[in-house]
C-alpha cells in the first residue's frame, strides 16, 4: 500500500509538474524578449555604421589634405606664402558666376543628415557609446553633448565634397567623383540592408533619407561629367570667359530692354489665358532673362523645400500610424471607459465602438488636411517670396531706396551686417521648420473645432452644441447685426449728401444722437472685433512666420524683428559685394589694354552736382512721368543707375585711386 501510494504520489507530482510546465510555454526563455506586435526587430547590418563613418571621415580628411596641396593661398599672401598650402573654400557665396547645383546638393545632404540625427541613439556613429544604466534601469548619460558634436562633425564630413567643385582642377573633380561615389554607395548599402527601422515609424528612415540619396546621386553624376569635360577641353582656365557671362547678360538686359508683348495688345483684347498668365507672373516667381538670384537665396529656397518635406514627414509618421492603430484596437470596453467620465454616446456598445472609430477617423482627416494646407501655404509663400527677393535686389542694384523699415545708416559692410549675411540661410531654414510646425498646430485645432462643432453633429443629428448656443443667444447676435446694418444704412443715406459730385457730411445733430445712443452696443461690437483682430493677427503671423522678407511687427518697430533685420542686412551685403554691373565693369577693366599716358587733368572723382542730381531724378522709381517716357527714358535711367552704382558701390570705394593715400584724384600720380 505504501509503495502504491508513493507511486501514485510520484505520478501526481509529475503530472502536476507537467501541468505547471505547460503554463509557461509562451513565456520568454532566458534573456530572450518577445517583440511587440507590429514592431520590427532592430536590424543588425553586416558592416557596422561605425566602420562606415570611420572610413568616410578618413577619406574626407585625406581629400581635404590633397585639395589643400592643389589650392595655394596666393590671394591672401602672394609673396610670403607662395608655396604654402591653403584651405580650399567649400562654397563661393558672393560669386554670381558659379553654378548653384553643387552647393545646393551639398547643403541638402547636410540638412538631411542632421534631420536623421533626431531619432538616432548614436549621433556620432564611429563612437559606439554604451550608456551606463542606473539602478532604476535608466541611462545616466545624456546624448545632448554628443549631438552637439555631431552638428560640427557632419559639416566637416561634407566639406571636401563641396570644396572639390570650387577648386576648378581636374584632379579635384576626380577626387570629388571618388568621394561622391563612396558617400552614395554607403547610403545605398545601409538603406538596402536595413530598409525598416523601429524608431518612430518603420519606413521613416528610408523616407527621410530620400533627399540625401537624391543629392548624393546628383553629385555622383556631376563630378564624372566635369572630369570628362576637363579631359575633352584639355584646359582648366577656359572658364574665365564664362565667369562674366551672367554679368554681361545682366548688362545687356539692362541697357537693351526688349519690348513686352503685353504692351502692344490692350488689356481688353487679351484672352483669358493670357490674363491668367500675366496674373501668375505678377503674383509668383517666374525666371527672368538677365537676372539670377544670389546663391544664398537659391540655397535658402531649396533648404526651405527640404525642411518642409522633412517636418511634414515627421509630423505625419509620428501621429497618423498611432491613430490608425488605436482606431483598429477599439473594443466594446471603450463604452465603460467613457461612462467613467460621464459620457454616454449610446446604449448599444457596438454603436459606441462605431461612433468612437468615426470620431477618430475625423481627427485623422483633420490632421492630414491641416498638414496638406500648411505645406501648400509654405510652398506658395516661398514662390512669392522669391519674386519679392528679386524685386528688392533689382531696386538696390539700380540705387533705389526701399521701404524696408527704418533706413540703414550706411551701405558699407559692418560687423552686424556680416553676421546677418552669414546666418541668413540657417535662419531661413529654422524659421521654415518652426513656421510649418506652428501652422500645423493652429490649422489642426481650427479644423478639429470646425469638424466637431459643425459637420459631425449635423451628420449624426446629435450633440448640436453650437446650434443650441446660438438658439439661446440669438437675441444678442441679432441686436449686434442689426446695429451694424442700421449704422451703415444711416451713414450712406442719412449722414452723407452729394454736392457737385463731392460727398459731404450732413444731419450732424442726428449723427451725434445716434453715436451717443449706440455707444453701449458699439462697445459690444468692439469686443467682438477685438477677438477677431487677435485671431486674424495670430493667423497672419502664423502663416508668414517662415518669411524673412516680411516684418511681423509695425514699420516703426521693424528693426526689432530678428528675421526681418537679418534679411535687410543680407540684402545690404549682397547688393554691395556681388553687384553684377560692378563685376562686369571690373572684368572689362581687367581685359582693357593699358592706355597711353595722358596729361594730368583736374581732380574729379565724381559727377558734377548738377549732373548727379539729374541722375537721381531719373532713378526715382515712383516717378510716373519717368516711367512713361518710353525706351529712351528707361535706357537713360539704366545708364544713370550704372554710373551711380560705379561711383557709390561700397565694394569699389575703398579701392578707387582717390581713396588711396599715395595717389591723387582722377588717377594723376605725383
From Swiss-Prot:
Intramembrane segments: 511-548
InterPro entries, per the entry: STRA6-like (IPR026612)
Spans through the membrane: 51-71, 99-119, 145-165, 169-189, 206-226, 297-317, 369-389, 424-444, 475-495
Annotated membrane topology: Multi-pass membrane protein
A molecular function GO annotation: retinal binding
Modified residues (Phosphotyrosine): 644
Domain of life: Eukaryota
PTM field: Phosphorylated on tyrosine residues in response to RBP4 binding. Phosphorylation requires the presence of LRAT, suggesting it may be triggered by the uptake of retinol that is then metabolized within the cell to retinoids that function as signaling molecules.
Carbohydrate attachment residues: 8
Annotated region described as Interaction with RBP1, given as residue ranges: 235-294
Annotated localization: Cell membrane
Domain comment quoted from the record: Contrary to predictions, contains nine transmembrane helices, with an extracellular N-terminus and a cytoplasmic C-terminus. Besides, contains one long helix that dips into the membrane and then runs more or less parallel to the membrane surface.
Annotated function: Functions as a retinol transporter. Accepts all-trans retinol from the extracellular retinol-binding protein RBP4, facilitates retinol transport across the cell membrane, and then transfers retinol to the cytoplasmic retinol-binding protein RBP1. Retinol uptake is enhanced by LRAT, an enzyme that converts retinol to all-trans retinyl esters, the storage forms of vitamin A.
Quaternary structure (record): Homodimer. Interacts with JAK2 and STAT5. Interacts (via extracellular domains) with RBP4. Interacts (via cytoplasmic domains) with RBP1.
Protein known as: Receptor for retinol uptake STRA6
Record lineage: Eukaryota, Metazoa, Chordata, Craniata, Vertebrata
Amino acid at each position: 500500500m505504501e509503495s502504491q501510494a508513493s507511486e501514485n504520489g510520484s505520478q501526481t507530482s509529475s503530472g502536476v509538474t507537467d501541468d505547471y510546465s505547460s503554463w509557461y510555454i509562451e513565456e520568454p526563455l532566458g534573456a530572450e524578449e518577445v517583440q511587440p506586435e507590429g514592431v520590427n526587430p532592430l536590424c543588425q547590418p553586416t558592416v557596422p555604421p561605425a566602420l562606415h563613418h570611420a572610413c568616410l571621415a578618413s577619406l574626407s580628411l585625406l581629400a581635404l589634405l590633397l585639395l589643400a596641396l592643389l589650392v595655394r593661398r596666393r590671394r591672401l599672401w602672394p609673396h610670403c606664402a607662395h608655396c604654402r598650402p591653403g584651405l580650399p573654400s567649400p562654397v563661393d557665396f558672393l560669386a554670381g558666376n558659379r553654378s548653384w547645383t553643387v552647393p545646393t546638393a551639398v547643403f541638402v545632404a547636410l540638412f538631411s543628415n542632421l534631420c536623421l540625427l533626431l531619432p538616432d541613439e548614436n549621433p556620432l556613429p564611429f563612437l559606439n557609446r554604451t550608456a551606463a544604466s542606473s539602478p532604476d534601469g535608466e541611462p545616466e548619460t545624456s546624448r545632448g553633448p554628443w549631438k552637439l558634436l555631431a552638428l560640427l562633425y557632419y559639416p566637416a564630413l561634407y566639406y571636401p565634397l563641396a570644396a572639390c567643385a570650387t577648386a576648378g582642377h581636374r584632379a579635384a573633380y576626380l577626387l570629388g567623383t571618388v568621394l561622391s561615389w563612396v558617400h552614395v554607395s554607403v547610403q545605398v548599402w545601409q538603406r538596402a540592408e536595413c530598409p525598416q527601422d523601429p524608431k518612430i515609424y518603420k519606413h521613416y528612415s528610408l523616407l527621410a533619407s530620400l533627399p540625401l540619396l537624391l543629392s548624393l546621386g546628383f553629385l555622383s553624376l556631376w563630378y564624372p561629367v566635369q572630369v570628362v569635360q576637363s579631359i575633352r577641353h584639355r584646359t582648366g582656365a577656359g572658364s574665365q570667359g564664362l565667369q562674366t557671362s551672367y554679368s554681361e547678360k545682366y548688362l545687356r538686359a539692362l541697357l537693351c530692354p526688349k519690348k513686352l508683348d503685353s504692351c502692344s495688345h490692350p488689356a481688353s483684347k487679351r484672352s483669358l489665358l493670357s490674363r491668367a498668365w500675366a496674373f501668375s507672373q505678377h503674383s509668383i516667381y517666374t525666371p527672368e532673362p538677365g537676372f539670377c538670384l544670389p546663391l544664398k537665396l537659391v540655397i535658402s529656397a531649396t533648404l526651405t523645400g527640404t525642411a518642409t518635406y522633412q517636418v511634414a514627414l515627421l509630423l505625419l509618421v509620428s501621429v497618423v500610424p498611432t491613430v490608425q492603430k488605436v482606431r483598429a484596437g477599439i473594443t466594446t470596453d471603450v463604452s465603460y471607459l467613457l461612462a467613467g467620465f460621464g459620457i454616454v454616446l449610446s446604449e448599444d456598445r457596438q454603436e459606441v465602438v462605431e461612433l468612437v472609430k468615426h470620431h477618430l477617423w475625423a481627427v485623422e482627416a483633420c490632421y492630414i488636411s491641416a498638414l496638406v494646407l500648411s505645406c501648400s501655404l509654405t510652398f506658395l509663400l516661398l514662390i512669392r517670396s522669391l519674386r519679392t527677393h528679386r524685386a528688392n535686389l533689382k531696386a538696390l542694384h539700380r540705387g533705389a531706396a526701399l521701404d524696408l523699415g527704418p533706413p540703414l545708416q550706411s551701405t558699407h559692410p559692418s560687423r552686424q551686417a556680416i553676421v546677418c549675411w552669414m546666418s541668413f540661410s540657417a535662419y531661413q531654414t529654422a524659421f521654415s521648420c518652426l513656421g510649418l510646425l506652428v501652422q500645423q498646430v493652429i490649422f489642426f485645432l481650427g479644423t478639429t473645432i470646425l469638424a466637431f462643432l459643425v459637420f459631425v453633429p449635423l451628420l449624426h443629428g446629435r450633440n448640436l452644441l453650437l446650434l443650441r448656443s446660438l438658439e439661446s443667444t440669438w437675441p444678442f447676435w441679432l441686436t449686434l447685426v442689426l446695429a451694424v446694418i442700421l449704422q451703415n444704412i444711416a451713414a450712406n443715406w442719412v449722414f452723407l449728401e452729394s454736392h457737385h459730385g463731392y460727398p459731404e457730411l450732413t444731419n450732424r445733430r442726428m449723427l451725434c444722437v445716434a453715436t451717443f445712443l449706440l455707444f453701449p452696443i458699439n462697445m459690444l461690437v468692439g469686443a467682438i472685433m477685438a477677438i477677431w483682430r487677435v485671431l486674424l493677427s495670430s493667423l497672419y503671423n502664423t502663416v508668414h512666420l517662415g518669411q524673412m522678407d516680411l516684418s511681423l511687427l509695425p514699420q516703426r518697430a521693424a528693426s526689432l524683428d530678428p528675421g526681418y533685420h537679418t534679411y535687410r542686412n543680407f540684402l545690404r551685403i549682397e547688393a554691395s559685394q556681388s553687384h553684377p554691373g560692378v563685376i562686369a565693369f571690373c572684368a572689362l577693366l581687367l581685359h582693357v589694354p593699358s592706355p597711353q599716358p595722358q596729361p594730368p587733368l583736374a581732380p574729379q572723382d565724381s559727377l558734377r552736382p548738377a549732373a548727379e542730381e539729374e541722375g537721381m531724378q531719373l532713378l526715382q522709381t515712383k516717378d510716373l512721368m519717368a516711367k512713361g517716357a518710353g525706351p529712351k527714358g528707361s535706357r537713360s535711367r539704366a545708364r544713370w543707375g550704372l554710373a551711380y552704382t560705379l561711383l557709390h558701390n561700397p565694394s569699389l570705394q575703398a579701392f578707387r585711386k582717390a581713396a588711396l593715400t599715395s595717389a591723387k584724384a582722377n588717377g594723376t600720380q605725383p
